């Protein structure tokens, strides 16, 4: 039996909430299971690791950074807008912005989902639509909370893959496919540091990658949902996990 301790170590950014009156940081198991099924070893990253000296010690131990989704939203001041965000998680924002920039500098693989994509957009100088439902030209991208969870995560709309990017390389025989949709915010302005990898039929950005980086991919949908049952989702996670081999080889050449 393979020793999981030999698998690539993937740092997973946690989310803050409250449990019986106590400040708590958690991760949904679907995100962790997707990493394990793809051959990685997930390690939870609490927000205190945003401290620069701790982050500097942590990063050499990680083979990848995983930014899962969250009920919270990125604080608007981080992308130049005024106002408060009622569903904020400042600790996650602090860690995510710090670890994204540090990982990009060190060329560590990154996989970002939903809020994670939005963090990747903001960290590289872009901005967000705070309420997609107020943009008349856009589809309804939120889930129906009255439906059973299985139906909330059912395919909702198509995405069109842009040619010549990371996503098309991972999915060479698949230029468009259906995805689930469970988000109220989305990318508004994408910085020149990013490449748009896919869009929904209304033109909204559904996937991005960082230019001149071996693997820094963000997707707006949720491939972690029953990831082992869907070939497209497995390919994305396996691509992320195997990217660490290229990262190690690159470090050895330096």
Swiss-Prot record:
Function: Involved in the breakdown of putrescine via hydrolysis of the gamma-glutamyl linkage of gamma-glutamyl-gamma-aminobutyrate.
Domain Glutamine amidotransferase type-1: 16-250
ATP-binding recorded as keyword: no
Pfam families per record: Peptidase_C26
Disulphide connectivity of cysteines: none
Signal peptide limits: none
One GO CC term, this protein: cytosol
Keyword Hydrolase tagged: yes
GO molecular function: gamma-glutamyl-gamma-aminobutyrate hydrolase activity
Keywords: Glutamine amidotransferase, Hydrolase
Pathway: Amine and polyamine degradation; putrescine degradation; 4-aminobutanoate from putrescine: step 4/4
Enzyme Commission number(s) from the entry: 3.5.1.94
Active-site residues, as the UniProt record annotates them: 114, 222, 224
Catalytic reaction annotation: 4-(gamma-L-glutamylamino)butanoate + H2O = 4-aminobutanoate + L-glutamate
Record-level GO BP terms: putrescine catabolic process
Domain of life: Bacteria
Protein species of origin: Shigella flexneri
Protein's name in the database: Gamma-glutamyl-gamma-aminobutyrate hydrolase
Family membership noted in the UniProt record: Belongs to the peptidase C26 family.
């Amino acid at each position: 039996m393979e020793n999981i301790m030999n698998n690539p170590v993937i740092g997973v950014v946690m989310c803050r909430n409250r449990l019986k009156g106590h400040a708590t940081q958690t991760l949904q198991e679907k995100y962790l299971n997707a990493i394990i099924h793809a051959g990685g070893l997930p390690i939870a990253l609490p927000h205190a690791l945003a401290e620069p000296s701790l982050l500097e010690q942590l990063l050499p131990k990680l083979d990848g950074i995983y930014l899962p989704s969250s009920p919270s939203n990125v604080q608007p001041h981080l992308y130049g807008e005024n106002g408060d965000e009622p569903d904020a998680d400042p600790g996650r924002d602090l860690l995510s912005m710090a670890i994204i920039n540090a990982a990009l500098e060190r060329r560590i693989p990154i996989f970002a989902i939903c809020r994670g994509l939005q963090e990747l957009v903001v960290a590289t100088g872009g901005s967000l639509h705070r309420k997609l439902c107020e943009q008349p030209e856009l589809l309804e991208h939120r889930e129906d909370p009255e439906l059973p969870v299985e139906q909330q995560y059912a395919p909702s709309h198509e995405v069109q893959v842009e040619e010549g990017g990371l996503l098309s390389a991972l999915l060479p025989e698949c230029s468009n496919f259906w995805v689930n949709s469970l988000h109220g915010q989305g990318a508004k302005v994408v910085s020149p540091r990013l490449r748009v990898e896919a869009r929904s039929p209304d033109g909204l950005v559904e996937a991005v990658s960082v230019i001149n980086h071996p693997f820094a991919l963000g997707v707006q949908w949720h491939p972690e949902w029953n990831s082992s049952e869907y070939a497209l989702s497995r390919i994305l996670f396996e691509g992320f996990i195997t990217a660490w081999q290229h990262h190690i080889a690159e470090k050895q050449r330096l």
